[in-house]
Amino acid sequence: MINILEVNETNNMIEQEKLDVRTITLGISLLDCCDASLDTLNQKIYAKITRLARNLVSTGREIELEYGIPIVNKRISVTPIALIAGSACQSPEDFVSIAQTLDKAAADMGVNFIGGYSAIVSKGMTWTDELLIRSIPHALSATERVCSSVNIGSTKTGINMDAVRLMGQIIKETAEATQEQNSLGCAKLVVFCNAPDDNPFMAGAFHGISEADAVIHVGVSGPGVVKHALESVRGKDFEVLCETVKKTAFKVTRVGQLVAQVASERLGVPFGIVDLSLAPTPSVGDSVAEILEEMGLESVGAPGTTAALALLNDQVKKGGVMASSFVGGLSGAFIPVSEDQGMIDAVIRGSLTIEKLEAMTCVCSVGLDMIAIPGSTPASTISGIIADEAAIGMINQKTTAVRLIPVIGKDVGDMVEFGGLLGHAPVQQVNTFDCSKFINRGGRIPAPIHSFRN
């Protein structure tokens, strides 16, 4: 039974500890929009998105006012565009026109991002997939709200090294195409292994083909709440620490579950999942890094960091699963450098390197996220980092991703401003030894032996 103390506790989480619903994401299937005419395809895409999403933003605001729960973003994800545009698109420029249609639909609906300018190439690339991938630099430079993702591997299929090599080049080209904005286009481009179909978070959201025609997903966020809870158990043993994280994650997820159910009912769209991810922001007191330091680390990156993150990730899942009927997406702890003030501080003081971040991705929710690297970094080195991260995901049967930003004209130690939720980041050192001969072999890395479950 709910008592007044729990009500007050939730109010305090929202007012003082930065608890919010990070996103309500409306997933929309565009499979029924396929057409051999590019103009007709664009018209169908725009018409379907605007028909289904016309009340998304207003409904989100109503829920905010009625329940007092901040909902930071209202977003849209769509079917991976490479799957629906094969008949209509004969060149990268044709795909760019679809990106511009998505951008216009997002702007007209009042959402800040639309995801799904994507290709799924974990085993091989069709001609259409390759056209879309090659269009990404132009598409992201010509739009404001479009987010792109490419899935280059999975535990079941292995890693498509041809796609890995190509994505290193595409990230470099995207950085160059948006260099006037500190290579911001790369912040809207994610390379995945084991990408989920129901991720509500950008920039990696797309509406998977296993999903219904339309569905509501919700992503919660409460790093500040978890940190505040841990302040009351300083010096206690690990059992108490784990119990505290688990109970707090339960309460945070319950808020997301409530918002998801209400939004689903009012929009007349099925409820999909709640994503349990602890998503930080650049605001002070809204940091995953500060949670790890509250556990007893002098600075994130110190010995013990990976163990602390593993503990946090696991307890968040255990608490969250009890709080929602349907849990999905990425669900864990995000460690984006530019979006987390604690991570930024750790990089500046020298305790946190890319290599340590890679180790942390073995046990956390996603991967190497929002990391600024020198603009002179070769495409082959970026591909090598993608391959390393994909291997972690493939072998460990988990989602991993890379969102690197080679900032043109910047070098190690320079500070780069991205703005808003994307924050700012110091440019980090990348290992300069060459891996091009390895990357240029081409072909596929086979799936691991434990992927054979039949």
Curated annotation (Swiss-Prot):
Gene3D superfamilies in alphabetical order: 3.20.70.20
**Matching Pfam families:** DUF711
InterPro entries referenced in this protein's UniProt entry, alphabetically: UPF0210 (IPR007841)
Disulfide linkages recorded for this protein, renumbered to the chain, are: none
Q: Spell out the family assignment given in the record's similarity comment.
A: Belongs to the UPF0210 family.
Q: What PANTHER family does the database record attribute to this sequence?
A: UPF0210 PROTEIN MJ1665 (PTHR37560:SF1), UPF0210 PROTEIN SPR0218 (PTHR37560)
HAMAP family membership = UPF0210
* Identification of the protein by name: UPF0210 protein Mhun_2657
Give the source species. Answer: Methanospirillum hungatei JF-1 (strain ATCC 27890 / DSM 864 / NBRC 100397 / JF-1)
